[in-house]
């Protein structure tokens, strides 16, 4: 038997995990896997277009992704913990048959056990609460009934204060988790139970927030308030857990990373809002700043026989005939492009230029004046420009223009994350590096082991369990990438809407840590076959295990390839493309860095071949930015790409993306990064002026003088002074 794959120094895999990993490399297992995946590399292009990009999947699908296939044995343990409480109180076993008073008595008993000193008692009560959060599935057989039960129980648990209690439990377990030098699977099991309860309640709140006719709107508002206005928010706790895991993974390899990232993503999604809420908020903010709403959509272009009289319109019509029903976006013109056009026209026809005058057209020919009118008609002022203008006024005239900070959700989250923002971004990029490898020989290289993944293997069916592990490993990576991509995109979009300097600071943190290279290396893989490979075993999903049979048989693998496209993989591929577009848009230095990546245009060309409109759109946008650095021969060979760019990507009125810029005419290195350096300086001044106090709190000098510490008068709360002797007796003298 082959030795286990290479691992980071200082790590040790569990024995069962070693055996299954070694079994993965055996000849019989590889033949089984190759037969299982032989049809996965085919690209059914007509079915890829069926995927609809949304903020997240439905509640049950998201809950299924929370659990690994190796956690199926814990479902029964949760049910037994609940039955023990029922037996203790002398109540009927069925949750549906209990009255409201009896349900409250059960929750009261479990909540009391959560405060017990014994860890085993606390965790046993947590298992019982997790069974309730899972919908009390023992009496259910229907999926719809199961979803309703999860929704009702989740709201009931939040109303009873279980969510806050589990946040406190999480703090205790995290503190104990990192104080121990030797960890085992049991230490991670406690964290997994707590995170499962928190995530299930969060997912129920997300479902109620998306439901316009929900009866629990006040619970959603209370949840958002608790996330944003708490002194120690759960969002910050989860980010700190992520940083500790990435920095000290040699000691905490049992850390449930997937559950942490999934919970963090859903908390940000609830607090900040999804894409539809973002567009509505953007329209309101633009109107408050005196700007018209963004004209992204227009009427669908339909063929018109009268347009054959115009040759240019005829060319457009031919392009539309092959892409019927596509929404055409109006072109935009920036203010600096308008000023540049007017300045060049004056220098050409009047041999003069007037500074700070962008309206005078006296002396210019009539065609130029008509062109300027058309440009003004399509003039678009981005919201970030207003942010920059307001920041300049605050800096130059602080007395007459005070900085009025609106406490929006994005502002509050930025204040939470600012002291350690760079560490958080580095940790997310490390996770992308670990999980962005989709070859079997690279699956374990340079990354910590995964806890709660290996099922209990039967020696008689070792190959079958190895195949399940193989599928679950890739599934685990895909879910982690899905969460990380959504977190990055959510933060980028909402911070850009709140204040452009916050967005630029996050972009700077990511670009400085080589996010462009990391994402391009990720897309260098076979993405076309990857988005159609479904690493899923429906028979082992959470909903199927609790309502049916969870026994692993060879027949259950036949259900894997029923779907032809992986919505999970499509989701984070689109997200990563959108993140790349956000980071390099209107940044020449970053575009050149992206273009300098080996075979970057070939990588994007392969993405364009995927027949999905959203992936194709963002890949074409990246190609359009790099087009001015491509030579004539490349453009001749890829005329179809230029045609696709004209048909799909929004163009500017005086767009010159086809103008070739030879290397000898490019700016030197200092001039090329001049804008980046100025932007970095503005960001530093913005953060120092607004959040300087938050950063200073992280660098307070500590006085280690014992005498001064003893002489210091500490003011204790009244309740602590009153119960001081009782506390000493219970905690220290017993």
Where do the model's predicted regions map?
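Extended alpha-helical scaffold domains
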Residues: 2-734
């Amino acid at each position: 038997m082959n030795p286990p794959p290479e691992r980071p120094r200082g790590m040790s895999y569990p024995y069962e995990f070693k055996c299954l990993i070694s079994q993965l490399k055996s000849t019989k297992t590889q033949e089984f896997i190759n037969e299982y995946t032989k049809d996965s590399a085919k690209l059914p292009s007509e079915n890829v277009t069926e995927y609809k990009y949304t903020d997240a999947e439905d509640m049950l699908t998201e809950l299924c992704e929370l659990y690994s296939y190796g956690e199926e044995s814990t479902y029964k343990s949760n049910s037994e913990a609940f039955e023990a409480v029922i037996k203790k109180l002398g109540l009927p076993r069925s949750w549906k048959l209990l009255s409201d008073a009896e349900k409250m008595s059960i929750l009261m008993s479990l909540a009391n056990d959560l405060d017990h000193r014994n860890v085993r008692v606390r965790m046993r009560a947590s298992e019982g609460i997790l069974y309730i959060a899972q919908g009390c599935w023992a009496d259910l057989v229907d999926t719809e009934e199961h979803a309703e039960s999860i929704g009702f129980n989740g709201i009931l648990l939040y109303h009873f204060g279980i969510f806050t209690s589990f946040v406190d439990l999480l703090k205790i377990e995290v503190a104990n988790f990192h104080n121990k030098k030797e960890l085992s699977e049991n230490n991670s099991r406690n964290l997994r139970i707590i995170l499962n309860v928190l995530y299930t309640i969060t997912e129920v709140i997300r479902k109620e927030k998306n439901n316009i006719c929900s009866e629990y709107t006040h619970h959603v508002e209370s949840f958002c308030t608790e996330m944003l206005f708490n002194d120690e928010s759960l969002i910050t706790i989860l980010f700190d857990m992520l940083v500790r895991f990435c920095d000290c993974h040699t000691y905490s390899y049992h850390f449930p990373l997937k559950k942490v990232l999934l919970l963090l993503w859903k908390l940000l999604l609830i607090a900040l809002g999804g894409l539809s809420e973002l567009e509505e908020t953007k329209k309101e903010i633009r109107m408050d700043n005196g700007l018209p709403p963004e004209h992204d959509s227009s009427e669908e272009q339909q063929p018109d026989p009268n347009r054959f009289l115009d040759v240019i319109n005829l060319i457009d019509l031919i392009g539309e005939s092959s892409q019927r029903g596509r929404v055409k976006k109006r072109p935009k013109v920036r203010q600096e492009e308008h000023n540049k056009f007017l300045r060049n026209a004056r220098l050409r026809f009047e041999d003069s230029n007037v500074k700070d005058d962008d309206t005078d057209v006296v002396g210019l020919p009539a065609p130029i004046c008509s062109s300027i009118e058309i440009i003004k008609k399509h003039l678009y002022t981005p919201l970030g420009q207003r942010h920059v203008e307001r920041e300049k006024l605050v800096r130059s005239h602080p007395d007459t223009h005070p900085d009025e900070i609106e406490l929006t959700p994005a502002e509050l989250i930025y204040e939470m994350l600012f002291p350690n923002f760079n560490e958080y971004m580095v940790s997310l990029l490390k996770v992308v590096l670990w999980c962005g490898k989709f070859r079997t020989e690279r699956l374990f290289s340079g990354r910590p082991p995964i806890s709660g993944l290996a099922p209990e293997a039967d020696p008689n069916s070792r190959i079958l369990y190895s195949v399940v592990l193989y599928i679950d490993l890739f599934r685990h990576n895909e879910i982690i990438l899905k969460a990380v991509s959504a977190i990055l995109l959510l933060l980028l979009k909402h911070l850009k809407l709140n204040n452009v300097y916050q967005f630029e600071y996050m972009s700077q943190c990511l670009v400085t840590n080589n996010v462009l290279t990391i994402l391009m290396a990720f897309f260098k893989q076979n993405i076309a076959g990857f988005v159609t490979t479904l690493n899923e075993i429906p028979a082992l999903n959470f909903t199927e295990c609790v309502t049916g049979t969870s026994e692993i048989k060879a027949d259950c693998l036949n259900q894997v390839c029923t779907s032809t496209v992986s919505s999970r993989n499509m989701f984070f591929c689109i997200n990563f493309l959108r993140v790349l577009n956000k980071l390099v848009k209107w940044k020449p230095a970053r575009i050149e860095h992206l273009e300098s990546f080996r075979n970057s245009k070939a990588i994007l060309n392969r993405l364009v071949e995927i027949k999905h409109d959203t992936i194709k759109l963002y890949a074409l946008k990246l190609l359009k930015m790099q087009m001015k650095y491509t030579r004539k021969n490349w453009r001749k060979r890829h005329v179809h790409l230029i045609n696709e760019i004209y048909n799909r990507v929004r163009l500017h009125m005086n767009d010159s993306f086809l103008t070739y810029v030879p290397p000898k005419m490019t700016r030197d290195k200092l001039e090329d990064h001049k804008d980046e350096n100025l932007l970095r300086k503005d960001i530093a001044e913005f953060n120092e002026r607004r959040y300087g106090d938050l950063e200073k709190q992280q660098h307070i000098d500590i006085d280690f003088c014992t005498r001064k510490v003893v002489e210091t008068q500490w003011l204790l709360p009244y309740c602590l002074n009153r119960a001081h002797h009782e506390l000493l007796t219970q905690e220290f003298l017993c």
